[in-house]
Amino acid sequence: MLIQKKDGFKFGVDAVLLSHFSNVKKKHRVIDLCTGTGIIPFLLEGKYSPKDILGIEIQDEFVDMANRSATLNKTHNISFISEDLKNLKALKNIDKADVITVNPPYKLNNAGIVNPSDKLAIARHEIMCNLENVIEASRILLKDNGRIYMVHRPERLADIITLMRKYKIEPKRIQMVHPKLGKAPNIVLVEGQRDGGAFLKWDAPLYVYNEDGSISDEINKIYGRDVNE
């Protein structure tokens, strides 16, 4: 059970796809950046049961809801803190992670109509942190050879690769997600490795819907649904 406000920010398919794309082991310490109300840590716990998960979020109200969800679900290995990813000095005092996951704000601060609700605007627009802040913070928080898994928009892929390399995080794997066959991708999943060697793998693309509008078998499997029903 996840505590969220009815009129607040809600998680979507992006969080589910990111948790599926991430390679997490039981021995791993995981940090989820821009965690919001904590959906990705709870999905990772249900799927992989890692040793420890820390969610970092700048909005105190979201952190409070996430910690109450952890208490409600009796997940003792998940915790949440309020911190600004631009506060690099504070980040250096946090125990480093084997894996970082992040579903960051997608929209540039000067792009599109900004939501009048500050909380929703911060979740969707690069107001409190931008893509470079996220990747620089990841460099600090990752162990040597640790991995970052990010979900974003395809139009930002060039920025993601450029910034990862700037902070010595090597892009290792990319997967495009399309609404359906014949449509341009609208989601990109990226894996990077701190101080990794140069080798990039492309996963087969994912299609969310079939031609008839039904949900694809691939997506049903990711959600744990029986595709034979």
Which sequence ranges carry the predicted segments?
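Class I SAM-dependent transferase core
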Residues: M1-K25
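Conserved SAM/SAH cofactor-binding pocket of Class I
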Residues: F21-I113, E136
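Short glycine/threonine-rich catalytic loop with a Thr-x-Gly-x-Asp
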Residues: F9-F11, C34-T37, G182
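Mobile active-site "lid"/loop adjacent to the S-adenosyl-L-methionine
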Residues: P104-N133
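Conserved beta-strand segments of alpha/beta enzyme cores
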Residues: M1, D52, N77-S79, E170-R173
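A generic structural micro-feature
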Residues: K47-Y48, N93, G182-N186, L200
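Conserved Class I SAM-dependent methyltransferase catalytic core
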Residues: L2-Q4, M128-P179, K183-P185
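SAM/dcSAM-binding transferase cores
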Residues: A184-E229
